[in-house]
Amino acid sequence: METVALGIFVFELTGSPFWVAIVGFLRMVPMLLLSPTIGLIADRTNRKILLGSTMAVLSAVYVVMGLLVVTGLVELWHIMVGVTLSGVMWSTDFPVRRAMIGDAVGAGGIATAIGMDMATSNFSRVIGPLGAGAFLATLGVQAAYFTGAILFAIGSLLAFSLPYVAPVSKPGPRSGYFANLAEGLRHVRADRIIVVTLVITITMNVFGFPYQHMIPVIGAETLKVGPLLIGLLLATEGLGATTASLIIALKARPGGYTRIFAFGSLAFLVAILMFSISPSYWMALPALLIGGFSMAGFGTMQSIIIITSTPAAIRGRVLGVLAAMIGTGPFGALIVGVLAVRWSASSAVTAMAITGLVLTILPLAIWPAYLRSSVRPGESATGLVTEGER
């Protein structure tokens, strides 16, 4: 809801796609800078307390931003500060929540658990954009802020009340900060499945997902629609992603994790390419539905592959590395913003999608065994087990 509402609001406020992209940059850059550290903290502290505290702070940030809008005091720099603070909190949510899921269900149930987590997250991307569009068309952006504040306050209370027991650490002296980070990075480098997964993750976040920042601009400038129909565009993507996440939760098997991840990534990039060249709203809508469906293959399998390839003791650290790779997205937001100013928002997304396709195909061509691999916890350091070896 916040992403859509702020994208539309900032574009109406400034008339510049570049500032819309800057909002996306500031929201994501804390994930790049802080996630490895937060992953280490998640391995050393009570994850339930960390998650509940994160949501409480997010609720407070949203209340302050909503009050600034209601009183008419809000300026662009307030929005930038608020988005940055939100980004810091979101960089905590990802490694902590996913590590907790892995702790709770174990390797055997991880596909179903992450699939359901993604399904609920993606369903919020159906309700959120529709709510954001409706609020902006009627009550204003403050309604989106106050609604978010209420939801995060509820989430915080639920997190603190979880019957979650933190994993018991093995006795012995703790290593230093940098030694702990290095341990997580060594595990990443030694496992080729994780390496390829992270390379594609960077590509998707730099060249794929920044298109979302341009949807309000493309909707207004190219498709000639208002906030409500712009919200429907993003809700359609969320609907596709929710449907695919549920299917993955019920049907995915370890032998297919890497194929779902790779082909989902490629199909998503093709779909946003089709969206970027769509001449009408009603052609753009199905393109985003397909894009959302495909994106779920990438988003769900991304965490599943990492969690099932990583020992529980260092899972937070490795998920922190994954979150940092996701945090490269701000650079994509800047690139797409600059290209949108120079060309147009649609042309910028077209160029980004084509580049993303090339850079996703490249590692798959270099390591074709990735598509034949099966992810099994506790495998050798290479992480590659081809179907013929099982």
Model-derived regions: residue spans:
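Small-residue hotspots at the loop-to-helix junctions and early N-terminal turns
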Residues: E2-A5, F9, T14-G24, G115, ...
